[in-house]
UniProtKB/Swiss-Prot annotation:
Catalytic reaction equation(s): AMP + ATP = 2 ADP
Domain notes: Consists of three domains, a large central CORE domain and two small peripheral domains, NMPbind and LID, which undergo movements during catalysis. The LID domain closes over the site of phosphoryl transfer upon ATP binding. Assembling and dissambling the active center during each catalytic cycle provides an effective means to prevent ATP hydrolysis.
Lineage, broadest ranks: Bacteria, Bacillati, Cyanobacteriota, Cyanophyceae, Synechococcales
CDD domains registered for this protein in UniProt: ADK (cd01428)
UniProt protein name: Adenylate kinase 2
SUPFAM superfamilies per the UniProt record, alphabetical: P-loop containing nucleoside triphosphate hydrolases (SSF52540)
Annotated InterPro entries: Adenylat/UMP-CMP_kin, P-loop_NTPase
Binding site for AMP: 36, 57-59, 85-88, 92, 140
Associated pathway: Purine metabolism; AMP biosynthesis via salvage pathway; AMP from ADP: step 1/1
Subunit structure, as described in the record: Monomer.
GO biological process: AMP salvage; nucleoside diphosphate metabolic process; nucleoside monophosphate metabolic process
EC assignment: 2.7.4.3
């Protein structure tokens, strides 16, 4: 099974990706984790990405596509995966579809963890990620509305979007997702 996790900042994408990985025995491909590791290790791509991440901006599409392509060709993803933090725009979704077609790995579902903006802010402020400061959170929420809403429409039109209420306790959200897959 190949899943894309979608949602605003603080919606639980990383948490639910981990839970689903345990339940479904699939690797999690976390763009946030890949970016943080590349920045921490000062890889050439990480050095290019760092200023965008620090501002809370989305990385340019060619840079994101390069990150994801490098990861999807690794051998642990052959039987399926959970992709968290990518795509973030409709253009990236189309590019991902082309890449997956080339790799023979079609996407099964895009899971949207739905919460409101106030909950996004509250949850983000209670995390301990290096880029979770008020200015970056506000920027990311703005980018979510600008870019991710059209992405949801893209997957809805392809009839592979599952919207899940992400307000309940973590384990309950996991159960809601598993019941829908």
């Amino acid at each position: 099974m190949r899943l894309v996790m979608l949602g605003g900042p603080g919606s639980g994408k990383s948490t639910q990706s981990h839970n689903l990985s345990q339940e479904l025995k699939l690797p999690v491909i976390s763009m946030g984790g890949i970016l943080r590791e590349a920045i921490a290790n000062a890889t050439p791509l990480g050095i290019k990405a760092k200023p965008y991440v620090e501002r809370g901006d989305l990385l340019p599409d060619p840079m994101m596509i390069e990150f994801i392509q490098q990861r999807l060709v690794q051998e642990d993803g052959g039987q399926g995966w959970i992709l968290e933090g990518y795509p973030r725009t409709a253009f990236q979704a189309e590019e991902l579809d082309f890449l997956l077609e080339d790799l023979g790995q079609p996407l099964d579902w895009a899971l949207y963890l739905k919460i409101d903006e106030a909950t996004m802010v509250e949850r983000s402020l209670n995390r301990s990620l290096f880029d979770d400061h008020p200015e970056a959170i506000t920027t990311r929420i703005g980018k979510f509305h600008e870019y991710t809403v059209p992405l949801l429409e893209y997957y809805a039109a392809k009839q592979n979007l599952l919207t899940v209420n992400a307000y309940p306790e973590v384990d309950q959200v996991t159960k809601l997702i598993l019941a829908r897959l």
